[in-house]
Regions:
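Beta-strand segments within the central parallel beta-sheet cores of soluble alpha/beta enzyme folds
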Residues: 93-94, 128
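HotDog/MaoC-like acyl-thioester-processing domains
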Residues: 2-23, 104-163
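Generic structural detector for well-ordered beta-strands
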Residues: 28-32, 98, 145-147
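Hot-dog-fold acyl-thioester-processing enzymes
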Residues: 2-90, 153-163
């Protein structure tokens, strides 16, 4: 049974159920980090860390120029899980993420996601993620434990009679 849900007046399909996910599945995606994305993030979170936007300050640090907030990179990961693997209806239960190298403004990051465990009795999947910059340096890596969408029962007409 394929279930759809409404989002802003548009029908959307739920992500894949646990029975449809197998170890070894991969997703690759590329993200270019633009100033507008960083400014939106900083405005939304009210984060005024000078390391993220002030060139004068950043030039006096070992980073030498402004860097992308680590949590913003984590947001790209959570968005990919919500949109693609397993997709809409998924819920992140835990994450272990490292940031071995900084990401600078205007960087292009290649993300590779891979399903490394499927535990049906716990209704969880574990997805590894690695992000690399243009120099093929790993800038983000980790594992995310996800609860894929649950199978929904059809809603019958009489169910809503009391509303």
């Amino acid at each position: 049974m394929e279930v759809e849900f409404m989002l802003l007046g548009k029908k959307r399909k739920l992500g894949r159920k646990i029975e449809e996910i197998t170890v070894g599945e991969k997703l690759s995606m590329t993200e270019k980090i633009e100033d507008k994305d960083i400014l939106l993030y900083l405005g939304l979170t009210d984060d005024a860390n000078p390391l993220y936007i002030q060139h004068d300050y950043a030039s006096q640090t070992p980073f030498e120029k402004p860097i992308v907030p680590s949590i913003m990179l984590t947001g790209i990961i959570t968005s990919a899980i919500s949109k693609y693997l397993p997709g809409p209806g998924s819920h992140i239960l835990s994450q272990e993420i490292d940031f071995p190298k900084p990401v600078y403004h205007y960087a292009t990051i290649e993300f590779l996601f891979e399903v490394i465990a499927v535990t049906r009795d716990e209704h969880t999947v574990v997805i590894s993620v690695v992000g690399s910059n243009e120099k093929n340096e790993t800038v983000i890596q980790g594992k995310v434990k996800v609860c894929p969408p649950h199978r929904l029962e059809e809603i019958h007409g009489k169910t809503l009679d009391n509303f």
